Protein backbone atom coordinates (compact mmCIF):
# COMPACT_ATOMS: atom_id res chain seq x y z
CA UNK A 1 0.00 0.00 0.00
CA UNK A 2 2.86 2.43 0.68
CA UNK A 3 4.03 2.17 -2.92
CA UNK A 4 0.63 3.36 -4.19
CA UNK A 5 0.59 6.22 -1.69
CA UNK A 6 4.01 7.31 -2.92
CA UNK A 7 2.74 7.77 -6.50
CA UNK A 8 -0.50 9.44 -5.43
CA UNK A 9 1.23 12.05 -3.30
CA UNK A 10 3.29 13.42 -6.20
CA UNK A 11 0.24 14.26 -8.32
CA UNK A 12 -1.36 16.72 -5.90
CA UNK A 13 -1.37 20.24 -7.36
CA UNK A 14 -0.02 23.05 -5.24
CA UNK A 15 -2.91 25.51 -5.11
CA UNK A 16 -0.81 28.28 -3.60
CA UNK A 17 1.57 28.28 -6.57
CA UNK A 18 -1.34 28.24 -9.02
CA UNK A 19 -3.04 31.13 -7.24
CA UNK A 20 0.21 33.13 -7.21
CA UNK A 21 0.71 32.63 -10.95
CA UNK A 22 -2.85 33.72 -11.70
CA UNK A 23 -2.49 36.80 -9.52
CA UNK A 24 0.74 37.76 -11.28
CA UNK A 25 -1.03 37.55 -14.64
CA UNK A 26 -3.89 39.75 -13.41
CA UNK A 27 -1.52 42.36 -11.94
CA UNK A 28 0.55 42.49 -15.14
CA UNK A 29 -2.61 42.93 -17.21
CA UNK A 30 -3.86 45.78 -15.01
CA UNK A 31 -0.49 47.55 -15.15
CA UNK A 32 -0.61 47.38 -18.92
CA UNK A 33 -4.06 48.97 -18.99
CA UNK A 34 -2.88 51.89 -16.84
CA UNK A 35 -0.19 52.87 -19.33
CA UNK A 36 -2.48 52.58 -22.37
CA UNK A 37 -3.44 55.69 -24.35
CA UNK A 38 -6.85 57.29 -23.88
CA UNK A 39 -8.16 55.99 -27.21
CA UNK A 40 -7.27 52.37 -26.43
CA UNK A 41 -10.63 51.21 -24.92
CA UNK A 42 -12.58 52.59 -27.89
CA UNK A 43 -10.13 51.05 -30.36
CA UNK A 44 -10.42 47.69 -28.61
CA UNK A 45 -14.23 47.83 -28.81
CA UNK A 46 -14.15 48.74 -32.50
CA UNK A 47 -11.78 45.84 -33.26
CA UNK A 48 -14.16 43.45 -31.49
CA UNK A 49 -17.11 44.82 -33.50
CA UNK A 50 -15.26 44.26 -36.79
CA UNK A 51 -14.42 40.67 -35.84
CA UNK A 52 -18.04 40.06 -34.84
CA UNK A 53 -19.16 41.05 -38.37
CA UNK A 54 -17.45 37.94 -39.73
CA UNK A 55 -17.32 35.45 -36.86
CA UNK A 56 -19.60 34.88 -33.88
CA UNK A 57 -17.31 35.37 -30.88
CA UNK A 58 -17.58 36.02 -27.19
CA UNK A 59 -16.05 39.47 -26.44
CA UNK A 60 -14.52 38.01 -23.28
CA UNK A 61 -12.48 35.68 -25.50
CA UNK A 62 -10.68 38.60 -27.15
CA UNK A 63 -7.61 40.18 -25.62
CA UNK A 64 -5.96 43.28 -27.01
CA UNK A 65 -2.68 44.42 -25.53
CA UNK A 66 -0.47 47.36 -26.41
CA UNK A 67 3.21 46.97 -25.56
CA UNK A 68 5.45 50.02 -25.73
CA UNK A 69 9.23 49.77 -25.67
CA UNK A 70 11.75 52.45 -24.78
CA UNK A 71 12.78 52.55 -28.45
CA UNK A 72 9.50 54.31 -29.37
CA UNK A 73 8.22 51.03 -30.76
CA UNK A 74 4.63 50.01 -30.08
CA UNK A 75 3.27 46.51 -30.62
CA UNK A 76 -0.45 45.82 -30.73
CA UNK A 77 -1.14 42.19 -29.80
CA UNK A 78 -4.55 40.70 -30.55
CA UNK A 79 -5.60 37.24 -29.36
CA UNK A 80 -8.98 35.87 -30.42
CA UNK A 81 -10.37 32.49 -29.46
CA UNK A 82 -12.35 31.44 -32.50
CA UNK A 83 -15.21 28.95 -32.25
CA UNK A 84 -14.65 25.49 -33.66
CA UNK A 85 -16.10 24.88 -37.10
CA UNK A 86 -18.88 22.32 -37.31
UniProtKB/Swiss-Prot annotation:
Keyword Cell cycle: yes
UniProt similarity note: Belongs to the MinE family.
Keyword Cell cycle among UniProt keywords: yes
Keywords: Cell cycle, Cell division
HAMAP family, sorted: MinE
GO BP term, pick one: cell division
Protein name, UniProt field: Cell division topological specificity factor
Taxonomic placement: Bacteria, Pseudomonadati, Pseudomonadota, Gammaproteobacteria, Alteromonadales
Entries under Pfam families matching the protein: MinE
Organism of derivation: Shewanella sediminis (strain HAW-EB3)
Function: Prevents the cell division inhibition by proteins MinC and MinD at internal division sites while permitting inhibition at polar sites. This ensures cell division at the proper site by restricting the formation of a division septum at the midpoint of the long axis of the cell.
Amino acid sequence: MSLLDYFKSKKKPNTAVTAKERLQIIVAHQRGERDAPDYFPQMKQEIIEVIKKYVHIDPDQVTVQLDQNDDKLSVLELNVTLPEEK
